[in-house]
Every structure is written in C-alpha cells, then in structure tokens.
C-alpha cells in the first residue's frame, strides 16, 4: 500500500504481516490489533498508531518526523529488530502500552522520547534518544540491554533490573524507583545524577556521575568491587550501607566533597575516598581492614567504631563516637594536621 500524500486508516484491525505501507504522513486508528510482523510502516512525515495491540516483531516502523504509538493497556511487541530497523523516529517518539516488549529490539528517536508502560522488557535490547529520555514503568527489565539518552534521562516507577545492562545519560540522570538491581551493570551520566530508591544493589556494578552524585536509599549494597563515583560532590544517605570488599576498582569515591549518612555502615575491606572534605554520620561502623581517606578535613560522628587493621586518614580528623567504643587494634588514625578523638573507650593495641 503506497500513497504520495497523507494516508489515514481507520479499521477494526489491520494485518500488515510481511507487508509494506508507505506514505507522506500516516495515521492508523484501530479498535483492535495491528500485526506488522516482518512488515514495514514508513512515513516521510508524522506517524501515529492507536489500537489495542501492536506486534512488530522483525518489523520496521519509521517516521521522518514525530511518532506516536498508543496501545493503551495492551501489548506493544518489537522483538528481534536490531538488524531490521525496529522503531525509528526522526522526531519525537511517544509510546504508551501496558506491556512494551523490546527484547533484542531496537527503538530510537532523534528528539525527545517518552515511554509509559506497566512493564518494559528491554533485555538485550537497545532503546535510546539523541535528546532526552523519560520512562515511567512499574517493572523495567534491562538485563544486558541499553537505555541511552543524548541529554537528560528521567526514570520513575517500580523495580529496575539492570544486571549487566547500561543506563547512560549525556547530561543529568534522575531516577525515582523502588528497587535498582545493578549487579555488574552500569548507571552513568555526563552530568549530575540523583537516585531516590528504596533498595539499591550495586554489587560489582558502577554508579558513576561526571559531576555530582546523590543516592538516597533504605539499603545500599556496594560490595564485591562495586563502584559509586562522582567527579564532583557525592552524597549518600541510607539506613544500611554495605561497602565490603572493594578491591582495586571499587568503593565509594568522589573527586569533590563527600557526605555519608547511614544508620549502619559496614565497610569491611572497603574503600571510602574523598578528594576534598568528608563528613560521616552513622550509627555502628565497621571499617575492619578498610580505608577511609579524605584529602580535606574528615568529620566523623558515629556510635561504636571498629577500625581493626583499618585506615582513617585526613588533612585534619575529628572523631566522636558518642561515648561508645573505638576499637583501633592494628588500625591507623593518620591526620596531617589536628587529630581530635572523643570516645567512651579506646583499644589501640598495635595501633
């Protein structure tokens, strides 16, 4: 089906299996489903599809201007389209679906992209915009997948599974989520990053911002060489922060100042490194065989502090354990200037 001008299609359903629809502008309005399996929908200008379901597996949907795909609470399937062209808009791209399946799929826009889906499955898929990317989803699966924005990225919703996946923003990244599973995954921005999540698991993963990074979570797990890093200031707030076994490549690292607030901090064999001042406020702290280093002043307010075989170092250090015990057996407190320790009891054997 081909039209030199604009083409408007209204029907109960449309079967374009292995077919081709070409027009100068395309609007498809259906009561039911559109089957574009191995088919092609091509528009030189705008393209819009509305219906109850859209299946474009192994297919191509392409527009020279803005594109809107709306299946309401239905399924939009774009699987296995990495080598087929997938869904591509030279303008903005707006998608609404109950379930968006982009497994091993390809979905891109040259301008702003907005996705609203109850469930978004981008496993081993590519989904991106050369401008901003805004995603609202109850469940987002991005294992070994890639979500990329040329400018800002905004994620909101429920659970994000990004194991071995990539979330990348060319400028700022903002996420408001329930759970972020980023084991062996990468979450990176060239600007500022702000993440507000209930639970964050970054074991072996990378949370990196070229500018400031703020992460607020009930539980933060950054074990097994997990890396949380900022090019400017870094702010972490959690009820429980685990930063164990950082190894040579992991830890919590900032080029600028660092602020840590935690109910419980376990940094056994972990690394906390600030390029400037470091302010730490916590309940119980375990820094056994760990390293806490500030290139500026280090202010420490906690309850019991276990620094056995650990290192706490700063340009100047002030430690207050609120009358609790400081266990520094085999540990080191190293201040280039003034060192102040206020504690209930201190064990400094071999320290």
Question: Which residues does each predicted region cover?
Answer:
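A composition-driven surface/loop motif
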Residues: 1-351
